[in-house]
Amino acid sequence: MVISDKQTLRRCVKQAVRRAAVVETLLNFDAARGEMGIKALTTSISKAQGLTPLQADAAAAFAAMDALEMPIEDIPRAALIQSGYTREAYLREILDQMRAKRVFACVSIRDAQSAVFEDDRIAPLLTLPEDFFAPGRYGVEYARRAEEIHLAAQQCGARDVLIRQFDEDALRFCLIPVCEDERLRLHVRLDTCAQADGFLRQLDASHTVRALAFGDETVEPMLIEAAATRRRLLVRANKRIPLALEKLGLRFVPYASEADLPEQMLGRWITAREAIWPALCDAYLPLARCGYPLTSEAIARDVQALLGGHFLMDDDNTHEAYQE
């Protein structure tokens, strides 16, 4: 169906976003042993003296409960209903409601040997603790750290590794080389433009490493500009979605929950998608107005690519990239 008016466009894009399978690139949760459930979800947002909960994550928590058909007005009853699920079945229900295609759950390098996942949609994101590159008496033994990353990736089957705290020397002498040798994709958080500049220099010096970079709203514009000319760089742009659409088309990641609980992940996705589809509508509208033959089928393909298709395509092609 060719779309010719704004209302049809809005309806089509909204429907496509809500129906699409999504890839979650950062879940801060121990999928094997971490505590989850309604009690854990509502601990920080419980009503105080009957007042309306306005905490930052309240909407996401209650959106998750609604999606899971848990009674929002009766938390004890909701917890009782949830207790009737096995852990595996409850996690599966969350992923089903989210329409999750893949969820990258953090696995500490120190727990890699015992990492086990109860659903094949969950993939390990090997995570380095903040003190991993802390210097000892004789400095940092980068070769030893690289060997630890290599061993941990083999133990848990990880193809992705995350560094939360930028360290240019660690990138140069350990992470970039080990990602080249072990064919790992590097996830990196960048808190300043200076860090982004240092990271881009390291990425450009390598000919094979693929990376997913992300930062706060002040860093996103620089990363978006950088990704426009770097095929091996994907950017996660949660706040600057219109700019990313303008500069990168659909080749970026518009969302990550960074949630501590699976239910929180579900709720944050439900709220995040309500910001994604209007931005997509605004990007499509000029095309529709100038007579471009925009169809609902094309929009569905676009949305699927945006919400994880590009990320998984890069994942599947990583090994090919090392042969280039």
Model-derived segments and spans:
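Metal-dependent catalytic cores of enzymes that make or break cyclic nucleotides
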Residues: 188
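Extended, well-ordered protein cores
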Residues: 217-219, 230
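Metal-cofactor-binding active-site regions of metalloenzymes
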Residues: 2-184, 204-208, 224-324
